[in-house]
Structures are given as structure tokens and as C-alpha cells.
Amino acid sequence: MSKHSTSALTMRDALYEAPGPKTKRKIMVGTAVSAVVVACILLAILGRFYATGQLDPRYWTFFLEWSTWRFLLQGFAGTVRVALTAGAISLVLGMLLMLGRVSKIKPLSAACRVVIDFFRGVPSLLLIYFFFLVVPQYGIKMSSFWMLTLPVALAASGVLAEVFRAGVNAVPRGQVEAAMSIGLSPAKTMRKIVLPQAVRYVIPSLISQLVVVVKDTTVAYVVSYPDLMQNARVLITSYDALVSVYFTIALIYILINYAINKA
């Protein structure tokens, strides 16, 4: 076992002591009680759905038709297009904003800090309304795809810029000094030494932010973009089946986000 792994194991043991028999019994009891409470809540919800007729077959049988799933798959494809495009744009823009934020040029650093704080603070829904209602007033025509994708990407870029900056700050200062001492320029040091390590450090945070991007696409109804949620709203209107459709769509989104986290 390497010295690094031994040190990490020692630190983990110091922070998280293995539970003893008494603690294990408490955990088992707590788990059992929680399971019973959750089961009771689910039964109460199902009972309420049954009492109001939401479990009637007419609200569920249309999911046995291929046309329903084809329509949902079309919306799923729209969601994937927006999520991938917005994710790619936000990664590039977030990296550029981070580089500007850590720049030694003070005006550039200050400007990037303002932009980052703005995009982090403004809700993505407000940005979508801006692109949908305000931007066209200035003669700029956009498709519903870009009216949704750009705001989602901008909102995510502010968060990703800070994620990247945290990764850069996590790189040991000694490595930067060593690179500078052998004659590497600050730009080459950032590109060859700092960024590769910083990106590895923040991969879990990048995945989490991609999940947020997928969730942000659910407001596509604002711009009438045919994503998964928008097509679900059409099904609800067509079949008057709010509970069954939203339940199915929720499961689909859970599977999408689970797949992203496991990627």
C-alpha cells in the first residue's frame, strides 16, 4: 500500500470511526422505522389516488401504445440536444471565465468576476424569459432551441467557472513554482501543469452540474420547445392524465440523471 493511500486511510479512520454494536443496532432500528414510515406514506398516497380515480386504467393504458412512447422519445431527443449543447457551451465559457478570473490583468479579472457573479445569481428561468421576450425586441431572431439552450448554458457557465477555479486552487502551489523555475511561462504552466490536474479534481462537480443542466431544460414550455416535459404536457392535455404522465416522466428523469452520475 502506498504512503498516500495509507495516509488517506488513516485520515478516514480518524474522521469516521467504525460503528460499534450499539450504534449498529441504532442504525438498524432507524432504517426499519424509516422504511415503515416511507411505506405508510406511499400507501397513503396510493390510497388517495385510488379514491380520486387516478389509478383507473384509462389513465394508464395509453402508455401501452407505441405512438405514446414515440412522442415521448421525440421529446427525449429534444432534451438531449439541448442538454448536450448547453453543457458543451457552458464548459467552454466557464473555462474562459475562470481563466479571466485568475488573470493577473486586474480589469479583466474584475470584469470576469462580475460576469460570473451575475450568471450565478440570476435564475436560469429569468434568463430564458429575457431571451424569449426582450431579445426579439431588438430584431434578433432565434429559434426556440437557442432561446432555451443559451440561457441554460449561461447560467451554468457561472457555476462552472467557480468549479474550475476551485480545481485550480487545489493544485499544490509547489508544482506551479517548480514549473516556473524550469522556465515554463505562466500560460504553459496553466495549460500543461495546472489545468489537467484541476479538471480531474472537479469531475464529480462537473457531473453534478450536468445534472442541473438537464433539470433546467424542463422549463422549455416557456419557449414552446418540444422537449420531454413539453411533450408530457401535451399528453396530459390529450388524455387528462396528470398523475400518470408526471409519474412516468419523473421516472425517466431519474433514470437520465442516474445514468449521468454513473457515466
Where are these regions (language model features)?
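Transmembrane alpha-helices and adjacent helix-loop boundaries
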Residues: 2-263
